[in-house]
Amino acid sequence: MPAGQFQPLPCALPGVLAVQASSRHRFARHTHEQFGIGVVERGAQRSASGRGEVQAVAGDIITVNPGEVHDGMPLDEAGRSWRILYFDPEVVAPVCHDVSEGAARLGEFRLPVLSDRTSAAVFLQLFDAMTSGNAADAALRRDSLLMLLLARTMDCRHGLREGEGTPSAIAHALARIDDDPSVPVSLDDLAKASGLSRFQVLRAFNRATGLTPHAYLVQRRIDLARRLIACGRPLADAAIGSGFADQSHMTRIFVRKYGLSPSAYAAIATGRSLR
């Protein structure tokens, strides 16, 4: 695959995005709304995540949890190639429930990088099962491999339980942004929503999300823009509808964070090849 290419593949299971990629791009700090797990096929990269700075080389498993702030850069000019599956939390939740025997409703990947040949082999089999159509026994193979892979790589026994999560005070400030990221918001607004001082809001945001309030707002706007684009909204409308000044503003943020333009992402969302 040529460097700089992101190739989406048709996926048999709803709520799963399969991508084969090759890139020399240095990704800025960003988050995903999905769980991501993949294998580096060529080259190597360094990345900072909520679980520390790591390096991944060919054959390694790479993972990311929803909302986890991370970046990524190749270790040399040759770049790196990888395959990755992104899972909506609704896909992962029942697997975690089964693996934990009902103890957890959602888990998280334990490590951002794993050097585990067995898990890598299982992932590649799962990637093939997810992208090879709907044979008579495809669902059984797919579901079995998914459960095996997540049982090996995800902590489902100490996952999030009811009543756990973000402290209630800052949760109100997060909700102020999450409810409609397109609406302008000030630090004063967030302080009033949470009942905290502006400085307390800054510290609490960093503890809860790893981002400043402004960076969190921009990320949530990008998340909203991605959903609008995936639903077929014109790019200019998606930009305005998600709170950006215009399409060029959205495009600059998109490229910095994800290494591809909104129009390229639209192609991925509709299953078209990126060339």
Predicted regions and their residues:
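C-terminal regulatory/oligomerization modules of transcriptional regulators
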Residues: L148, R272-R275
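N-terminal positioning helix adjacent to the helix-turn-helix/winged-helix DNA-binding module
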Residues: G165-A173, T209, V218-R221
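N-terminal regulatory/effector-sensing and dimerization cores
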Residues: P2-A104, A135
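Amphipathic alpha-helical interaction segments
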Residues: R141-L148, S168, H172, D189
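Basic, amphipathic alpha-helical hairpins
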Residues: F127-A136, R152-L160, A173-S186, F205, ...
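Amphipathic alpha-helical segments enriched in hydrophobic/aromatic residues interleaved with Lys/Arg
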Residues: D98-E162
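Conserved catalytic core of the tyrosine transesterase superfamily
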Residues: G165-A171, D188, Q200, R275
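Basic/polar phosphate-binding segments, predominantly the helix-turn-helix DNA-binding elements
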Residues: D178, V183-R220, A239-I268
